[in-house]
């Protein structure tokens, strides 16, 4: 991480939320800000910080900003990182380097690596007189023969059920439903996430072991000259390191390709690699999700040690899934609704396995699972006033949070509560992909939801996608808007999220008799409290 690497350059770095820095940004050390936007608004733990900056305090700090975003969200792309950068500069701050910009639809990690290197290079130039720079190798590995357990201490849930909803077929992946008992003391709200720490698929781990001529029970001892996410100074199996500590399938960055080209001893392969780090990178690497391992297998003349390989890999990341249940159903158990990604690799090497989805798919009843609750954005929950109408738009497993919303409304009806209308616009490829059809029918009969469905492989009356249904119902949507309804979307950022936004702009244009720009502004204002999107890349 950035903080751990800072120690290599003589800095003792600390990490905290932006809100925690309100009123006391340090002036005696560099301030590095990494942040994103949520529908053009600050993240939950940055709202107070942004409001603080807008009071124009005196901030004579040295700072740098790196923003995270997704280029498909054109109107709000890096809006908050840019705003923070400009506000600090206008209140006395001095930029260490220009703002960095990571694109989740592009070479995000490559962009971050380049920005990080520029940051540390600039800091070194300014502070070489009083910084003790560590230049020794950061990671060394010794092959040993003794054994020791991992001993990781984390919160564990227990798998109560794991069933297939839809088998994998030629047009889509397997879909599964899991029920998980939460770790002791954890609670959740409808619309929250379950954060899961997975392990890598055995098939991919085996490929790495084969590439480096290691057996699964080979034990290593890792020593590091700086902070590291690896377990250090005691023996651990190579299998455990590869399965539980590093990302094996993340696309290789341009910089990493250049590193491999430098250790490639076949001239033809070296030329090809340098080309891949150039103009063809996005098409041949990013779009095909080619990993470091894929490159090592495709270009065998690359000479890389196991330690060098591990140094190229980021820490295994926690994945989060929308919870598809309500605590009114069971406050100690959550359900997940997932796609299981297992397809031929676009790189041409083996299969591409979704790390977390395959981990979850292979769990058995009574298995323990490393997990915890993570709160969703404050706006992505059912209204506290149950009488407020809600309109939900989803495709595929994007129905997950809305199953929880509807389950909650059904439970409230049983308790005699007055509830507003709930309308679900749901898109699937075929009728066989229609998830929770029986439950939705039951909930519709008791008045908890009205379901509008559409099937992209069975176009009817010109309607193919969710946005087609929404546009057809635009007069009803307008009435629901006038009645104070809240609108929610969950699904693919590139497909559903962007399309629904475009559709709503058109509806507002017609409803308010205004132009596209004015309609877009109205929708932006709605995003503050009435129009919420939870999308995945």
Segments predicted by a language model, with ranges:
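FNR-like FAD-binding dehydrogenase module
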Residues: 1-537
């Amino acid at each position: 991480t950035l903080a751990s690497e800072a120690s290599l350059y003589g800095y003792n770095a600390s990490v905290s939320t932006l809100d925690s820095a309100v009123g006391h940004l340090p002036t005696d050390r560099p301030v590095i800000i990494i942040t994103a936007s949520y529908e053009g608004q600050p993240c939950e733990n940055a709202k107070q910080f942004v409001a603080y900056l807008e009071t124009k305090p005196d901030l004579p700090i040295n700072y740098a900003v790196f923003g995270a975003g997704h280029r498909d969200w054109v109107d709000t792309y890096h809006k908050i990182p840019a705003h923070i950068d400009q506000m600090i500069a206008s209140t006395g701050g001095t930029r260490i380097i220009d703002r960095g910009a990571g694109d989740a639809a592009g070479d995000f990690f490559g962009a971050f690596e380049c920005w990080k290197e520029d940051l540390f290079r600039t800091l070194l130039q300014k502070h070489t007189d009083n910084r003790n720079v560590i230049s020794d190798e950061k990671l060394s590995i010794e092959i040993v023969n003794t054994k020791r357990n991992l001993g990781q201490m984390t919160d564990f849930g227990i798998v109560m059920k794991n069933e297939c909803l839809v088998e994998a077929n030629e047009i889509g992946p397997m879909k599964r439903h899991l029920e998980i008992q939460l770790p002791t003391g954890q609670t959740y709200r409808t619309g929250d996430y379950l954060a899961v720490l997975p392990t890598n698929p055995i098939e991919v781990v085996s490929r790495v072991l084969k590439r480096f001529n290691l057996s699964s029970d080979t034990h290593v001892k890792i020593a590091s000259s700086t902070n590291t996410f690896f377990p250090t100074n005691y023996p651990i199996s190579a299998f455990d390191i590869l399965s539980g500590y590093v990302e094996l399938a993340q696309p290789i960055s341009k910089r990493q390709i250049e590193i491999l080209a430098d250790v490639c001893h076949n001239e033809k392969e070296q030329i090809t690699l340098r080309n891949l780090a150039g103009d063809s990178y996005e098409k041949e690497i990013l779009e095909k999700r080619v990993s470091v391992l894929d490159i090592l297998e495709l270009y065998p003349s690359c000479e890389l040690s196991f330690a060098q390989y591990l140094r190229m890999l980021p820490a295994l990341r926690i994945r989060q899934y929308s919870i598809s249940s309500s605590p009114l159903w069971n406050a100690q158990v959550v359900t997940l609704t997932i796609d299981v990604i297992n397809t031929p690799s676009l790189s041409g090497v083996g299969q591409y396995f979704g790390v977390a989805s395959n981990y979850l798919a292979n769990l058995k009843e009574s298995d323990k699972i490393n997990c915890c609750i993570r709160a969703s954005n404050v706006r992505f929950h059912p209204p506290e006033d149950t009488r407020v109408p809600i309109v939900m738009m989803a495709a595929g497993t994007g129905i997950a949070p809305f199953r929880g919303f509807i389950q909650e409304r059904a439970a409230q009806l049983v308790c005699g509560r007055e509830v507003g209308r709930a309308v679900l616009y749901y898109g699937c490829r075929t009728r066989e992909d229609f998830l929770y059809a029986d439950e939705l029918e039951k909930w519709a009969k008791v008045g908890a939801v009205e379901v509008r469905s559409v099937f992209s492989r069975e176009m009817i009356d010109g309607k193919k996608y969710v946005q087609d249904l929404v546009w057809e119902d635009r007069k009803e949507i307008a009435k629901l808007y006038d009645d104070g309804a809240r609108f929610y979307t969950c699904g693919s950022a590139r497909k559903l999220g962007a399309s629904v936004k475009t559709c709503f702009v058109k509806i507002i244009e017609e409803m308010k008799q205004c132009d596209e720009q004015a309609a877009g502004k109205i929708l932006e204002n709605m995003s503050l409290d009435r129009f919420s999107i939870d999308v995945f890349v």
